[in-house]
A protein has these predicted regions:
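Short, catalytically relevant binding-site loops at active-site mouths
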Residues: 34-39, 67-71
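Auxiliary Fe-S-binding modules of radical SAM enzymes
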Residues: 51-156
Length: 156
């Protein structure tokens, strides 16, 4: 996902630079964009990210959900058939997979307008509660109602 989204760095770069921050006793946070891996790949991306995050010590992992606007490059990629957006329930499942696979001591939050829900907790202590909450939402959510929120989100 990092290469496709033209981020200009690899997971190994993140690991190297964050270890330098830790060696200098500088705290840092991570930002996780739920949905960036695309349809059918969210849980793979979540597990790969958790594997990287588990090697480090971020203070906070903040997650937001991808919202695609018609003026974005990603929208053009969708129009060309090069990328497909995750559904809203799939985004919730991706967030659940991220939390399930994190083993480090950190805070996790979902703040910002792009999030359908607010999740806040301290891992690993709140993992079971957060996963249970997400499982309930995944089982009971209405994709069309969730999508309605996303398409009416004018700005972030």
């Amino acid at each position: 996902a990092l290469a496709f989204m033209n981020k200009g760095f690899r997971a190994s770069d993140v690991l190297e630079q964050c270890r330098k921050l830790e060696a200098a006793d500088i705290s840092y946070n991570f930002f996780y964009l739920t949905g960036i891996s695309g349809a059918g790949r969210g849980e793979i991306g979540a597990k790969a990210s958790a594997e990287l995050f588990n090697q480090l010590h971020p203070q906070i992992i903040e997650s937001s959900m991808l919202t695609i606007y018609k003026t974005s490059e990603l929208y053009q990629e969708i129009q060309r058939g090069n990328w497909k957006e995750e559904g809203e329930i799939e985004k919730l499942a991706e967030l659940k997979a991220l939390i399930e696979n994190l083993t480090i001591d950190t805070r996790i939050v979902t703040d910002g307008a792009s999030n359908l829900i607010q999740v806040r907790g301290h891992l690993p202590a709140d993992k079971e509660k957060l996963v249970g909450y997400l499982e309930h939402l995944i089982e009971t959510a209405d994709e069309a109602a969730l999508r309605e929120y996303r398409v009416n989100l004018r700005h972030l």
